[in-house]
Curated annotation (Swiss-Prot):
This is Neutral protease 2 homolog AN7962. Its main location: secreted. Keywords: Cleavage on pair of basic residues, Disulfide bond, Hydrolase, Metal-binding, Metalloprotease, Protease, Secreted, Signal, Zinc, Zymogen. Secreted metalloproteinase that allows assimilation of proteinaceous substrates. Shows high activities on basic nuclear substrates such as histone and protamine. It comes from Emericella nidulans (strain FGSC A4 / ATCC 38163 / CBS 112.46 / NRRL 194 / M139). It is an enzyme of class 3 (hydrolase). InterPro entries: Fungal_M35_metalloproteases, MetalloPept_cat_dom_sf, Peptidase_M35. Belongs to the peptidase M35 family.
Amino acid sequence: MKFIAPIALLGMFQAASASPVDIKTSNAGLQVTLSQINNTRIKAVVQNTGSEEVTFMHMNFFKDASPVKKVSIFRNNDEVEFQGIKYRVQTDDLSDEVLTSLAPGASFEDEFDIAATSDLSSGGPVTIRSEGIVPLVTEKSVTGSLSYSSNELTIDVDGAEAAKIETVGAQLSKLSKRTRVSSCSGTRATALQTALRNAASLASRAASAASQGGSTFTTFFKSDSSSTRNAVAARLRAVASESSSTSSGSTTYYCTDVYGYCSSNVLAYTLPAYNIIANCDIYYTYLPALTGTCYAQDQATTTLHEFTHAPGVYSPGTDDLGYGYDAATRLSASQALNNADSYALYANAVYLGC
């Protein structure tokens, strides 16, 4: 991991969660209906299919204006690389702008272009779908989770038209040609260096624990098979290794929001296609260096979370399928292996003996 302290041209490509006994799981759900508007432009209609009003955080979900992963795209059964951003968000003190409330049967629409976050210039048929879990919110804190799923939509992409859509990579290239940023120094540099040391320690401990398996392991990863233990341990060892060096490695880590993707409640983000990680302001002002509370957020596990997104650390990089204890522990075994917060929460649980 290359720690950017001072940062040159931009061309290089607490909150405590509720305890398990306090968290509620909704039996309701959200149904997502995907349809094609024009070529790679997609419309999603999200409907509350339950019998009660729900309030949820729509970050990393439909309605989020950032270039996040709203759908998975497949060509010949192989997933097309996602080139947008993945981030970790705070789970308490949430601002109104990141919350959506839906009465029973109510819905909202979101339109987005899948060519903005994936290279579809080769054209041809692709299939898209979406499923996962969004955080339920009560009094501006995550208190549960809500599942969602979509139909499967197959479209025929005009590659020439798709190539005209400006991608996240093209936006980064423009920034690199015109922008310089100030150095990363002082308290932020110190905080990030501490977070990296702590992340390395947490990941190393968690890797050792994962190799042995046990009840805490199966709580998060649903299986105690040797293949699951080995996969989790290998990723965590890779994170520990990446966190241990500030002069080498596969990722570039900025201590400020050099690309402008931080928004309300975002702690840090990763551009996995470029193995770039950046912290947001509230990473430093909102999070403790290392929490003493089970399943709470801190700087160390946020950094660990982001490292799991980067395929340069361990391939393939993880997605954000469920935030927080409740959502993460509702995932299937295969989903948990691909969920960033599962690793962060497990590392926290091992460290604190939760």
